Amino acid sequence: CIRFTLEDDLFYESTLRNLAEVLKETKTMTWISLPCIGGCPYTALNRQRNPQKESKFAMYETHFKFMLEQVDKVLTEACIARSKMANDDGIFVTDNDVYNNTTTYVKYAPLIVFELPTKNSYWTVDYVQAFIRKRCLTKFPLHGCRYNLRGKHGIAKGKLLRKEWTVACNSHNFGSRIATQCNPSICSPSEHARVSGKDTKETGNYTQELADQVHRSFA
């Protein structure tokens, strides 16, 4: 497992080269989780209340879009490189294969998982929807409470948190293995706490239970 975090800025060419090199390996999974504060419901409210800060809010989306474009570019380069390294049938992936989702592209594409909170507005923007179509991604629900996501502060401390993610991936087998939804008939809504305060930022971190399931599903 190789993590690309805030220290590995996607604005730097060195980061892109390192990422492309990793993705050349035969069995790789690319879990894409980008800063998405610009699309969260709270940001939408703040934009309405603080129109004088519109340039700041717009910058969030500009950065998100740029980083997704960079990841998309690296995925294409890696897919082409993987096909050339394999060279088992003399057929290489081309840019045209990627854009048209040909069987050649599907054969050499790494496992791709794109994650955003379910209610994040970035799911609705054109360039994210285009990325999903281009990479043949299917959406799956991922409810944090089923992976023991609990509050750590205030009245929510120790309670399960109502946090919903959606993952879009190009493997139905993998997606179905990590997908999970809260069942109201088993888990009472009263057992949940809303994400707020200090817990809001911290829920951006995955639980150990979720990380373990991701690794088991990919193994």
Features from the language model and the residues they span:
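Conserved active-site and SAM-binding loop architecture
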Residues: 1-219
